[in-house]
Design a protein with these regions (language model features):
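C-terminal ends of transmembrane helices
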Residues: 18-31, 53, 83, 89
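Intrinsic disorder in cytosolic terminal tails and internal cytosolic loops
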Residues: 270, 299-316
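12-transmembrane solute porter fold
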Residues: 4-16, 40, 51, 63-73, ...
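Short glycine-rich hinge loops at helix-strand junctions in the catalytic core
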Residues: 1
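Short, membrane-exposed interhelical loops at transmembrane-helix boundaries
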Residues: 264-278
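Flexible cytoplasmic inter-helical loops of multi-pass small-molecule transporters
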Residues: 26-41, 88-93, 307-313
């Protein structure tokens, strides 16, 4: 049952700890700088409130006073965080890191990409089970296509980015992902598992070609002393993108299903299959558009930054 999904992570986590103890270097570098407790508090509370609003908004309603309050206080907290980081002598995040356009642009592209790709993550399981009638196990076998393609293409794109740069590979990945998302608009009530699997492979390949080069661009343009913060920012962008994307996907899908069916259903997946598919088409069309928008920051990145990464990776 459901508990097994979480139990399976226990041995994986233990194995990861053991491998980390042996594989990761023992960094004995110490610093006298005090930890920025107020800054960490402002950031943690702000992100918590924003993520709560994005998660619960689709259930409570986006105009519910609690959701509006979460957004308002979360955004206010981010302003307080920036104000404090500029003021304190030992900031948790040195905001000057964002003056590097390649670094900031790559983070924006990551946010946009995961915002778009979460549409697929959220909606396709509904399509497989409620439209095609798959049971959870059958749906799981189909959904494995995306991580499978991702695991195969990520190492390849990583090596290629070290040789040819990160910019155009990241753009290629986003284009492939957008094509994969757009291909979901051709699904019908009669589509086969093989057809869905192939579309998911395309999306996974796109993510693989985008993610490794984009992360390399972020880490390659961060000071060595800020590698930890840069890695954390990658995770934050991914989390906010996925959470916001799922909320947006749910809202768009529900609205378009209701419009197509001509009446409201509760739960929404009880609507007729044709209406569910129509809603999926509209949502995936939006997701493909968002994926293309995520190209813009990467397209505007400096070519020189790519050359620096290539030079650094080729240095023995």
């Amino acid at each position: 049952g459901w508990p097994s999904i979480f139990y399976v992570n226990i041995p994986v986590g233990i194995l990861a700890i053991i491998l980390s103890l042996y594989a990761l270097p023992n960094d004995r570098q110490r610093t006298t700088q005090r930890f920025d407790i107020p800054g960490a508090g402002f950031l943690a509370v702000s992100l918590l409130l924003i993520l709560l609003a994005l998660t619960e908004g689709q259930y409570w309603g986006w105009t519910d006073w609690r959701i509006l309050a979460f957004f308002a206080f979360g955004i206010a907290g981010l302003f307080l965080f920036v104000w404090w980081e500029r003021r304190t002598k030992a900031p948790m995040i040195n905001l000057s890191i964002f003056s590097n356009w390649t670094f900031s642009a790559s983070l924006l592209s990551s946010l946009g990409a995961f915002l778009a790709l979460s549409f697929n993550l959220f909606l396709i399981p509904f399509y497989l089970q409620n439209v095609l009638g798959f049971d959870p196990q059958q749906a799981g076998f189909v959904l494995i296509a995306t991580p499978l393609a991702l695991s195969l293409t990520s190492p390849i794109s990583g090596r290629l980015s070290d040789r040819f740069g990160t910019r155009w590979l990241a753009i290629l990945g986003l284009i492939i992902s957008a094509l994969g998302l757009f291909s979901m608009t051709t699904l019908t009530t009669e589509s086969t598992a093989v057809g869905v699997f192939g579309r998911l492979l395309l999306i996974g390949a796109g993510v693989g070609f985008f993610q490794s080069p984009n992360n390399s661009a972020i880490m390659g343009n961060a000071p060595r002393s800020a590698f930890g913060i840069a890695g954390s920012l990658i995770s934050i962008m991914r989390t906010i993108g996925q959470t916001g994307g799922i909320a947006l996907a749910g809202a768009v899908w529900a609205a378009r299903v209701t419009a197509s069916a001509g009446e409201t259903y509760d739960p929404i997946n009880a609507a007729p299959p044709n209406a569910l598919v129509a809603g999926l088409h509209d949502a995936m069309l939006l997701a493909a558009g968002l994926c293309l928008v995520a190209i813009v920051p990467t397209l505007l990145r400096s070519q020189r930054a790519d050359q620096d990464i290539i030079a650094e990776s080729s240095t023995p």
